[in-house]
Amino acid sequence: MNMNFIRKLPIPLELKTEMPVSPALAAVKAQRDAEIRRIFTGESDKFLLIIGPCSADREEPVMEYLRRLRSAADAVLEKIFIIPRLYTCKPRSAGDGYMGFIHQPDPNEAPDIFKGVAAVREFHLRALKETGFSCADELLYPENHRYFSDLLSYVAVGARSVEDQHHRLTA
């Protein structure tokens, strides 16, 4: 198989250094993670609701959705803990077609995973900054988790990936 090397992806630490999570935002995420842990372990009687669009491929409409969801989440906080879905990968059974924001952050340009990884990190960082939500994402590529581990509160393994040994070992 012939491949053309275009450029090296940054290592996760490089990207985290370029786009850091502030101490204040890290505290917000830690608090949310602790609440999720309490729900999963039964220490909290709250329901956990992971909700959102199938694909987060257009930033502004998703941010508008998150702002509205923030109001709803605040209204039900005593009974329901909400984690928004901000799914940036689109698994494809046939392997072709649009594969999500991580592959093609600008639909008017050619796919570019280098730009995509940075765009996804910025997207999750913006969600946390502007709404206080640490989100859920389906990581089609388990190794990408290291780019977003300080931002995500929930990571999903999708239906097309459950039989993949790499995903199962990562989970």
Task: List the model feature ranges, each with a label.
Residues 7, 79-171:
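Active-site-facing alpha/beta catalytic cores
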Residues 19-23, 55, 107:
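N-terminal start-of-chain detector that recognizes signal peptides
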Residues 40-43, 70-77, 125-130:
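Acidic (Asp/Glu)-rich catalytic clusters
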